[in-house]
Amino acid sequence: MSANSQPIFDHLTPMIPAGKDMDAALAFYEQKLGFTARYKAEDMSMAILQRGSVEIILQNLDDPHTASQTSLRIQLTGVDALYSEYQAQAIPPFHQNVDGAGLGALKETPWGTKEFAVRDLAGVCIAFYERRS
């Protein structure tokens, strides 16, 4: 990079806790959410998951407090199709005060997005959204 060049940010890859069972967390992300494990550590301490250009690092860490305080927002094109895909995976409805995975309602927001949230097995909340034109 030359002295006059400005840095360009390309991607953000969050690291999130897997919860009590790394194998179950991997299965949830692969089978329910459609991610692919691009890398799995031999000792299963972490895995790099990918779907499209989005990457998530899943850590073999059981920390319910951290998980419940972690949330991600993933922007995409085709939020309606993704919501239908996740409904077909029989992810149970999202309830605020219930542990376990959950699927939130698809809604339009006042800030110009159409979105829904998924809570994973550890309690991490992931919002999938599309900007409305």
What are these regions (language model features)?
Residues T36-S71, L76, C125-E130:
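Conserved short beta-strand elements that form part of the metal-binding/catalytic scaffold
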Residues Y29, D62, Y86:
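Short, flexible helix/strand-to-coil boundary loops that buttress conserved ligand/catalytic motifs
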Residues P7-D10, P64-Q69, P110:
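Short glycine-enriched loop/turn motifs at secondary-structure junctions
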Residues E30-Q31, Q50:
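Alpha-helical segments within the soluble intracellular
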Residues G19-M22, L72-C125:
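Vicinal oxygen chelate
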Residues Q31-A37, A90-I91:
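Conserved acetyl-CoA-binding loop of GNAT-fold acetyltransferases
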Residues M1-L26, L72, Y129-S133:
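N-terminal beta-strand motif that seeds the catalytic metal site of vicinal oxygen chelate
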